[in-house]
UniProtKB/Swiss-Prot annotation:
Region (Alpha C-terminal domain (alpha-CTD)): 254-325
Keyword Transcription: yes
Name recorded for this polypeptide: DNA-directed RNA polymerase subunit alpha
NCBIfam families to which the protein is assigned, alphabetical: PRK05182.1-2, PRK05182.2-5, rpoA
Organism classification: Bacteria, Pseudomonadati, Spirochaetota, Spirochaetia, Leptospirales
Region: Alpha N-terminal domain (alpha-NTD), residue numbers: 1-238
Organism: Leptospira borgpetersenii serovar Hardjo-bovis (strain JB197)
Amino acid sequence: MSLKSLLKGFKRPKKIEFNTEASTPNYGKFVAEPFERGFATTIGNSLRRTLMSSIEGAAISAIRIEGVNHEFSFIEGVAEDVTRIILNLKQVRIKYEPEEKDQSKIIHLELKGAGYFRAGDLAVDSSIEIMNPDLHIATLNEDANLVMDLEIQRGRGYVPAEEKKKDIEVLGTIPVDSIFSPVQKVVFEVSETRVAQRSDYEKLTLEVWTDGSVSPDDAVAQAAKILKEHLTVFINFEEELEEEDDELDEADEKLKASLSKHVEELELSVRSLNVLRSLEIDFIGDLVKRSEEEMSKSKHYSDQCLQELKGKLSTLGLSFGMRDF
């Protein structure tokens, strides 16, 4: 069975609505509709789990401090002990794009005298961007001489320090718990939506928060690609996959032609045309997106006009409140 035949009759979103007004580098809201009942929950939950666990990011994986052999040490001239410094370093959010895949980076720091060690001090070159540069790491007095190396790696999810101990080669290197995931929170909501006269379809609203090293829309796109690649192994009709998913059948072509017509082609009365002009509706596609309540806002509106418009749309198999095209 071809992919086109397999999907016949299924209502699926044609595009994702991205709320640009509310979006920030750390937050994005996405709306997709319509879905057949049950599909919005399935897709929303799958995207949420993938976003939280499988998007790649960067984090500090190990540190080495001159004169320190283990994490339960104190450093002369530094108020915080090594354990507290490590806890603070775990919170640093980093954007790092290596020149070569799986390439780690060593940052060398030398801090002398009184002052504050903040996350922004780790941005030693253009390949490193710190997303929370004001994060406090340590307080130094005039006797301080803090010399340290930090290793930055890319990865997925959460990797505890215990798993890294076997890879430590340099004496005095302390492995650090790494939170690689740039996605901090994902919430999805499923609600009912109407398509023509049916109100039993579903709308998926997805909200994504990141640390800024990856934009929310990029994170969603990556999650969708990961899911897609995992599902292809279950497909055993490869030839059908080559067909264009969005290929329009004859009915779709007819609908597209109707929606692109100018409203004057409906041969309406002057009063009804005035209603459409006052609402700046020029094409049938614009008209069917409106609700009956929206139409009543025109000063030329009358029940007779509404009935005429509904009748004309009905002859084309259309109605008010259509959004699925």
